Amino acid sequence: METTNKANTMMAELKTLCNKDNIVLSLSQYEKLVGYALLLEDWNNKINLISRKEDAPILIKHVFHSLLIGLFHQFSSSEKVLDLGTGGGLPGIPLAIAWPDTQFLLVDATGKKIAACQSMIKSLDIKNAVAVHSRVEELKGMSFDTVLSRQVAQLEQLCSYASKILKPGGRLICLKGGNLDHEIKKALAGKKEKGSFPSVVEQFPVSGYSPCFTEKHIVIAR
């Protein structure tokens, strides 16, 4: 009963946030997103997937935060998406739930984290996401329209990884925090030196969507 009440409260909160920002989801998608938040919380008690010193609910700080990417990039049915360094499935699993016609590959170099992702994907019956224990260097012969990352790595390094596996015209989308001016400058300088990706880097502040997202940005490199 307690779990049911908690899930109902979480769903009502998520619906309020999504409706406010015109994020359209079905009842089944809401149920899966709340289910994922509960599973992530449970798994995080076993292995360290996200910080255990959370200052905000997982549903907002991690799940809703991931969904905001869809306000700045519309995923398509023909799109192949890589979630690089997915950790506990972020942002890949929430986005796979919200865009069931888009294919998502989640990779991480830590086997325990991928095992958790695989279990959650199976429990939630998500058909369009696959989690693989791998490093980006091992994804030989694969290419993607979009690369996602929530890693703390510098943007220049993430751009370097993405440039090797992005299709022409592809983009890297990152969830990052703090003042990014120096990171963006370095990433663009790296392009000038090496003659490669990215040509343009845009940053979109998301602090207006929740007090939890102070100094948070969605960064899109093309």
UniProtKB/Swiss-Prot annotation:
Lineage top rank: taxon: Bacteria
Gene3D superfamilies per UniProt: Vaccinia Virus protein VP39
Signal peptide: none
Family matches, as SUPFAM superfamilies: S-adenosyl-L-methionine-dependent methyltransferases (SSF53335)
Sample GO molecular function, one term: rRNA (guanine-N7-)-methyltransferase activity
Family label: Belongs to the methyltransferase superfamily. RNA methyltransferase RsmG family.
Protein name from the UniProt record: Ribosomal RNA small subunit methyltransferase G
Organism: Chlorobium phaeobacteroides (strain DSM 266 / SMG 266 / 2430)
Gene name of the encoded protein: rsmG
